């Protein structure tokens, strides 16, 4: 998997609590190899995400089931809406994510009962399942 934090390349300071330095929106480019997923099935506590599929074929797992997506498709998930993007095609699945970048974001993982809490940025996180655990524990 490959992720490029475009907003950070444009000067976003992810650890800043100053919203003018954080940018109001976060833009990420993602490439997911065939048969892999972007992240475990999860729901954000405060964040909205808009997905724009650039190329490839995928399956979006959500609370109502699964939906196939292809290049040109767009979809959105709001807070407390669990989701996961799985590459169900033979080629890389490439898409953009535009998120609203809230301060104090956390995520819940329904399959494992874990929580991810961002201390100052997504890179500075702790994952809790009764006690701190590995990020992919119980997800694979």
Model-based region annotation:
Residues 79-105:
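Ligand-binding loop in jelly-roll beta-barrel domains
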Residues 1-24, 34, 110-140:
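A short, N-terminal "cap"/entry segment at the start of jelly-roll beta-barrel domains
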Residues 10-15, 28-44, 79:
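Conserved short histidine dyad/triad with adjacent acidic residue
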């Amino acid at each position: 998997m490959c992720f490029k934090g475009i907003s950070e390349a444009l000067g976003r300071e992810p650890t800043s609590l100053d919203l003018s330095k954080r940018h109001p929106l976060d833009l990420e480019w993602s490439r997911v190899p065939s048969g892999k997923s972007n992240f475990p099935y999860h729901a954000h506590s405060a964040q909205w995400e808009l997905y724009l599929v650039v190329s490839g074929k995928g399956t979006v797992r959500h609370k109502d089931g699964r939906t196939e997506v292809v290049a040109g498709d767009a979809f959105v998930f709001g807070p407390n809406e669990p989701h996961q993007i799985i590459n169900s095609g033979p080629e890389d699945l490439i898409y953009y994510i535009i998120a609203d970048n809230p301060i104090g974001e956390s995520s819940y993982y329904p399959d494992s009962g874990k929580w991810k809490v961002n201390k100052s940025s997504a890179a500075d996180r702790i994952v809790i399942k009764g006690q701190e655990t590995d990020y992919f524990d119980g997800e694979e």
